[in-house]
Amino acid sequence: DVEKRNKALKKMVLFTLIMAIICLIYMLVTSYLSEKSKFVIDLSTLELVQLEEPEDGDPIAVIDTSLGEIRAVLYPEYAPNTVANFTELAESGYYDNTYVFHSEKGVYSAAGCLNKNGDLPDDFDKSRELVERELHQNLWPFKGALCSMTTTFKQSFGQRFTGGGTYYCGSRFALLNTVDITDEMKQQIFDLSNSEKLTDAFAEKGGVPNFSQQIVVFGQVYEGLDIVEQLSELKVEENEGSTKIPVDDVMINSIKIDKYSSEKTEKEAVE
């Protein structure tokens, strides 16, 4: 009997040890994946390219709306797949006569949808709505940022337990205005980034800091900021949904992809 009890005790100790090792491995893997998924900013290489003027030859989007024209420089070097998707859709005429379907009071507007309520059409091209989210430390949600809106989030079976997953973006885009950048918010930006340069940029330019490294920024408006402001101040319908649909139709008439020319810009300014 004593020998049986000893064997049973050894089995119990061995089982407990094995379970402890499994739990430890699980915790280490989870911790590793969690750390791996965090977005790290390298302050030594941080370049706030949106604060710079476009250079001759840079790709731009000329967005013609029913309220006026917006011009934005694009950043294929930082968000290549997003810019390619947007460019191909624009050049195909997809955005012609699409709706500004959301206006968040003073903060941002969302546009580029065939349906007024922002829903994708039944026959939408799934490949256009499954562009993996591209974040870059040089791109931030400053005022005038041109952003790609998130369409879906996918997780594998294992990721449901360990965390992680993949966000995808698509055809619809957002134009950011700004929230009130208070002293408290500036302190929060600095505490999270440890970057005076980034904090000062938000303070001077404005934007939506809460979107930082959450939304894909792929362009920056350099002409037509007054139109961006108007688009975020539209009168909207009263409804229980999350989409704040403008009462009056505001349209994206067309989007033309072009190259920036300082000479052309100077001539237009004179005219």
Name these PLM-found stretches.
Residues 1-271:
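Cyclophilin-like peptidyl-prolyl cis-trans isomerases
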